[in-house]
Amino acid sequence: MTTQDVIVNDQNDQKQCSNDVIFRSRLPDIYIPNHLPLHDYIFENISEFAAKPCLINGPTGEVYTYADVHVTSRKLAAGLHNLGVKQHDVVMILLPNSPEVVLTFLAASFIGAITTSANPFFTPAEISKQAKASAAKLIVTQSRYVDKIKNLQNDGVLIVTTDSDAIPENCLRFSELTQSEEPRVDSIPEKISPEDVVALPFSSGTTGLPKGVMLTHKGLVTSVAQQVDGENPNLYFNRDDVILCVLPMFHIYALNSIMLCSLRVGATILIMPKFEITLLLEQIQRCKVTVAMVVPPIVLAIAKSPETEKYDLSSVRMVKSGAAPLGKELEDAISAKFPNAKLGQGYGMTEAGPVLAMSLGFAKEPFPVKSGACGTVVRNAEMKILDPDTGDSLPRNKPGEICIRGNQIMKGYLNDPLATASTIDKDGWLHTGDVGFIDDDDELFIVDRLKELIKYKGFQVAPAELESLLIGHPEINDVAVVAMKEEDAGEVPVAFVVRSKDSNISEDEIKQFVSKQVVFYKRINKVFFTDSIPKAPSGKILRKDLRARLANGLMN
């Protein structure tokens, strides 16, 4: 529903009134126990499913029950504490997807510590920068990555490796820490405040330098509850579900919407360390995956792969995509591959914890939804759309900057009050930098990012719109559209295109394909053919890398 709220701000003893158009979920608000520490909330109902499979290690087939995960994470918490990791200390996870990611995150939470996760394929300099910025005291990793971080030992950073074989010199063995006396963990932490930070992901840096995002116990409890709690949860997971986790767990989407949401409801998580299309399809068939949480590059690979015809994918009842909008053509293609699945999207950003909106088609009692929509605002939260030029809130069907307010958003950026103040205003609204609108049925549609909009002679051109058209062409495997400087127009849209296998589609053919479907100022000016589109682990296109190619004359 939408309400016209009169908001009164007291500034210098002068009251000022303004009408804000605020959007809320079509689902009713629910009670959220966000006074609890995250681990207590996650395991609140564990007695009901302690013997049930919790984690399946895809490569090995090893299964951990909920009781195994609970006990082992508590023992690991005691082991970390014995090494000197205290409340508010930071533990870095430098691992591919594995059960140890789950165990380490929960163990840190138990002792009031904070986890920051980094991509193990980062360069040594990138890892070092994050470790130092977060003041990491201990790093959990695999032996093959130790060379990247061993210089940090000079600063007193401890390194724990998860390998079962021989470990590098001066490193500790993960398995030894999990054999510590488990009951001692109860007396370890001081009282954990709901406002204490529990996770410190670093934002993708697609519009600036990476910054530590402080997510609290209260924030993550709220975010998980907004998704999976209540009589009619927005994201209906159940204890019989097998949830696919192929998205990187060092990204907040997998950490929250897959790992934490699954643990809360007692579902089984199938953990896969990397995406490989044939292996993915084999595991879906073998483990009878019911929920596939994906991002557009994976959707694209599945939709365009002939391998899918060889496997039984009928167990999948839900396919949820996030990180970037899907076009209708891609939605239709993936629906054909998963005939029994509901397909929908969610919308989030790290700073929002991360979920702002989610398809109500995923609810236990689903609502009708439209193709291309990114869902409706989550319950127990508020959303508004602002005019980027005037700052006024906008009514339905008017595109503007998306803003969100609620207990789930970040506490702020680590050691960066200026960046925090420019993102969260004095009234608690988080400004996303994304452009979208809410229609007559409360559904959110993303237009693009403010800074990614192309300005052609004053006209705004949204890259996502053109990408959606282009990806529907059968001879195009992947695409990204960015702005290129042009003296007359200011900026013109250009496309980086990955041809489909055996395709020889030309630049002129692509231009004509688009020109027939858009107004004159949205026409593609140039096409550059490339082997791949650079993307962040979250699936978002790294447009700044493509703009750098243009600036350096390295288009092809």
Swiss-Prot record:
Enzyme class: ligase
Protein name as annotated: 4-coumarate--CoA ligase 2
EC annotation from Swiss-Prot or TrEMBL: 6.2.1.12, 6.2.1.-
N-acetylthreonine found at: T2
Induction entry: By wounding, UV irradiation, and pathogen attack.
SS bond list: none
GO BP annotations listed: phenylpropanoid metabolic process
Record note on what altering K320 to L/A does: Affects the substrate specificity
GO MF, one example: (E)-caffeate-CoA ligase activity
Signal sequence annotation: none
Domain of life: Eukaryota
Region spans: SBD2: 346-413
UniProt: CoA binding residues: K274, K457, G458
Binding site for (E)-4-coumaroyl-AMP: Y253, S257, A323, Q345, G346, T350, M358, K451, K455
Requisite cofactors: Mg(2+)
Reactions the enzyme catalyzes: (E)-4-coumarate + ATP + CoA = (E)-4-coumaroyl-CoA + AMP + diphosphate; (E)-4-coumarate + ATP + H(+) = (E)-4-coumaroyl-AMP + diphosphate; (E)-4-coumaroyl-AMP + CoA = (E)-4-coumaroyl-CoA + AMP + H(+); (E)-caffeate + ATP + CoA = (E)-caffeoyl-CoA + AMP + diphosphate
Effect on the protein of changing K211S: Drastically reduces the activity
